[in-house]
A protein has these predicted regions:
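Electropositive phosphate-/nucleotide-binding environments in soluble metabolic enzymes
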Residues: 18, 22-29, 42, 46, ...
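Histidine/acidic-residue-rich, glycine-tolerant segments that coordinate divalent metal ions
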Residues: 70, 90-92, 98-108, 115, ...
Length: 404
């Protein structure tokens, strides 16, 4: 299809973009499978970043590094819409059985970020084909380290929201499970995903022989009391009407049974859907740890590993974007409102700074392939979601820029 021959009016444009996305499906899937098979985790993704930049150049864009991520722009001045895709995997083995599974046994795309990057690449290609007709500017954000909650912050610090200033932002996340492809899930009334404040408490005691505990200060004993005291914060200091979770997921201390160690380390997360409760819990976590340690003659060092707010989508922008999604004549496309999840997403850092919308796109199966959830080594995602995601990104961008 000649890109310049698209019929550019509301009634026809949506189906044309979906048709174009279907034409590009094989290439989108190939991009997804390459990124999947070469999964990288964390802040530095050299192979993934190089692949994304090469593809953008192939499509006629001029990508540049932005911190540890990649950005590119196209359009004609005016308002600026940011389209964001994360592209990092997880530090875990893959057992999906797919022919393109990551072979290293150390990293895997079990959260679908390979889809996000591949769909945004194809969306960039279509938008480049339509650049002369755009009524504004689209900025693309290919982000690392979402899983460690570092990526958005890294790219913000390197200017992703400036030069030109971003006016609004949109991101998708694919969702596996036992459900058909075609659902798009959103929340325009409240918190869509919880905050996450990751913390590390290093308890400092005094080492001694296990036979002479009085000669030392036991950091394991202090750590146990800190752990128990922190659970009371949820039970007795937070409003039961608000969802709050405090979890200690790691407790490490000692090397031998007859030695009281010098230190113990606790790591955990605080998650909530309420900003005030978040502030309370972070402050009280620090106070409880410090004062409990002091009671037993020890001390603590507290480090905040991640600080991500709740993901709260802008209601007006979300209503607008959902309206554009509903315009698309795609078989099986179905809105699912009022979705909220206790997981966290560092797109919330973007949403805290500019009006933003975040949607889940179902990428599941109704048979046994939909058995496993995200972050499971056996999870499988349905590649039929690809043209839906591509068309949605393009259509929402075109329509939003046209209106604004």
């Amino acid at each position: 299809m000649d890109a310049e021959n698209y019929i550019y009016h509301k009634e026809a444009i949506t189906m044309d973009f979906y048709k174009r996305a279907l034409e590009l499906k094989d290439e989108t899937v190939a991009d997804r499978r390459y990124i999947h098979e070469n999964a990288e985790a964390g802040l530095e993704l050299p192979k993934t970043k190089a692949y994304v930049m090469d593809k953008l150049k192939e499509y006629g864009l001029d990508p540049v590094e932005c911190g540890e991520g990649v950005t590119a722009m196209l359009g004609n001045g005016g308002k600026v819409l940011l389209l964001r895709a994360d592209m990092d995997g997880l530090p875990m083995p893959e057992k999906s059985g797919e022919a393109f599974a990551c072979p290293t046994g150390k990293t895997a795309h079990t959260c679908g970020h390979d889809f996000h990057a591949a769909m945004l690449l194809s969306a960039a290609r279509i938008l480049k084909e339509q650049e002369s007709k755009l009524k504004g500017t689209v900025k693309f954000m290919f982000q690392p380290a979402e899983e460690t909650f570092q990526g958005s912050k890294n790219m913000i610090e390197h200017g992703i929201l400036e030069n030109p200033k971003v006016d609004a932002a949109l991101a998708y996340h694919v969702s596996p499970g036992k459900m058909p492809v075609g659902l798009f899930m959103y929340n325009d009334k409240g918190t869509m995903m919880y905050s996450v404040d990751g913390f590390k408490i290093t308890v400092k005691g005094k080492g001694s022989h296990g036979a002479y505990p009085h000669a030392g200060v036991d950091p394991i004993n202090i750590g146990v009391h800190i752990h128990l005291a922190l659970q009371e914060l949820i039970a007795r200091e937070t409003d039961p009407a608000h969802a709050c979770v405090l979890t200690i997921g790691q407790f490490k201390a000692g090397e031998a049974a007859n030695i009281i160690p010098e230190t113990a380390v606790l790591q955990g997360t605080i998650r909530t859907n309420n900003t005030k409760e978040r502030e309370l819990l972070v402050r009280r976590m620090k106070e409880v740890a410090e004062k409990t340690a002091a009671v037993y003659n020890g001390s603590v060092k507290i480090e905040m590993i991640s600080e991500v707010p709740p993901l709260i989508c802008n209601p007006a922008l979300t209503d607008e974007m959902i309206g554009y999604m509903k315009e698309m004549d795609i078989p099986g496309l179905t809105p699912v409102p009022d979705v909220s999840a206790s997981a966290s997403e560092d797109f919330a850092v973007i949403a805290e700074k500019v009006p933003s919308t975040f949607m889940y796109l179902s990428a599941g199966y109704t048979d046994e392939r939909g058995t496993y959830p995200a972050h499971n080594p056996k999870v499988q995602f349905n590649e039929d979601v690809c043209p839906i995601g591509v068309a949605g990104l393009v259509h929402c961008a075109v329509q939003w820029l046209k209106k604004h």
